[in-house]
């Protein structure tokens, strides 16, 4: 009951932030974002890409929101060039290596990404943030975040390293992907997600847009180029904006996991690595590093005509 109440308060706060930012001039909104929103991510807030359409027509104008939030409800990030290392639309076909469209914008743009959907087939939107530093003045908050993401022993490790509890420093970086299906029924289900070589990455091993709809989704988690075993992934299933289900899974020895799918739903898959940084005290660097992966897609409810 307490957790439910806390979640309700957090969701209400996110909605309040979204409303406030919407009324602000672009320049003021940018400052508001940098001061109040950027510090949120490592406090167990997911980061994901949400396109204006998961199934656009060929060449259709498309936007991509960068969202920070919880339970698949978030505040839309503005375009901040200094906080972006990669933002692109990629192909998945035989010529996928040459099918790359860099997504750029102006400081303060929201949604952060604007693009044309391109030719028919599966497309990948990828976004990589620059590293951001965070300070926890409360060890309890660090412990809550670590436990939520599957690192129950992190605080004990921290104390075992002889590090202070009143100033826990962390450096984090985000790696987000979104799968969209461009085109009509003749192209429904063509193309395949692929490993892009991100520091942490979730790869869909089946096309979620194939028809008839998949009954389950096999995914594989990679870290530093290799499959990551025994890692937690969290799956958010959005039936509608007010109805989101959450489930947690573990990857097997080959970095794979599998979860059930329902037609007509949106999915967010999330995974985090939290690891100590050696020599942090001597170098003045962060004590911990976290890297975050997310993948969004939609399962169609009917074949697009």
Residue ranges and their predicted role:
Residues 26-39:
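Bacterial N-terminal signal peptides
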Residues 109-113, 247-265:
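Glycine-centered loop-to-beta-strand initiation motif
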Residues 130-138, 275-280:
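Short acidic/polar inter-strand loop motif in beta-rich domains
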